[in-house]
Design a protein with these regions (language model features):
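C-terminal structural segments of small proteins and small subunits
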Residues: 53-89
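Compact, glycine-rich, soluble single-domain proteins
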Residues: 7-57
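Intrinsic-disorder/low-complexity, polar/charged segments enriched in Ser/Thr/Lys/Arg/Asp/Glu/Gln
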Residues: 1-5, 61-63
Length: 89
């Protein structure tokens, strides 16, 4: 299963708007994707409640994993999304 690590750029981390954008993008991939904060347990990235429950803050490292056809491309798209400070606009 491919994995990617990325530091979250949004000033407030994965809360409210950034979390919503992230989850919408995950769902649009059609793939099972997980996200974990640091060395924590992975959660289903399709659930906004689980994603927000991780309490990911600015510059926290998360690990994304996906399974299925085009998993690498989906992970790259998600990494690029998390590198953007969505709170700056």
């Amino acid at each position: 299963m491919p994995e990617r690590k990325v530091n979250v750029a949004s000033r407030v981390g994965l809360h409210a708007r950034p979390a919503s954008l992230f989850v919408q993008t995950v769902v649009s991939t059609g793939l099972p994707v997980t996200i974990a904060k640091g060395d924590g347990n992975p959660v289903d990235a399709r659930s906004i409640l689980l994603v927000m429950g991780l309490a990911v803050g600015n510059n926290d490292e998360v690990t994304l994993a996906a399974e299925g056809e085009n998993a690498d491309a989906a992970l790259e798209q998600l990494v690029e999304l998390l590198k953007i400070d969505h709170d700056a606009t």
